[in-house]
Amino acid sequence: VQSQWVSTCAGVFSKKVFTKFHFDNQFMKYSWNEYLDFSYSIFKEHQKSLFVTPQAKYIDVATSDGRIPLKELIYMSAVYDMYIFLNRFEMTYKNILIFIWSMFGRLIINIIKILIRYPKKIKLILDYLYAPIYVMLNFSKIKKGNLDFFNKTLL
């Protein structure tokens, strides 16, 4: 099945791909959509070159090692998603509306997840509500491709 992006946790790429395409060094510490950015950049230049197969099997060995606190992940997802959106997609009214709608949907889903999975961490809801504001306060930096304001908080 042809695809516009491939998850790199189970993706296979030819070695020569890495001579032309690279992971963006703005993404730090934890895996959050850098695979989307990497593989989508391949798709943009070589459409019909990415495939996924439903027959592929792999084992995801979950571990707590290297996981970041939920609060940090909330802000990371908001900042990195805006970065990808601004750098990979046309700024049409349709795309902007779809992006905003998807962020709103994710906000609702994540609030429900917190209420169900982490009822003792209900304060995380405030982080989910503030993360889009944080992104807008730093919008010009994100648009310029400078994520240092956020990445320095990860070290």
Residue positions per predicted region:
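A short, conserved alpha-helix in the catalytic core of glycosyltransferases
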Residues: 5-21, 27-56
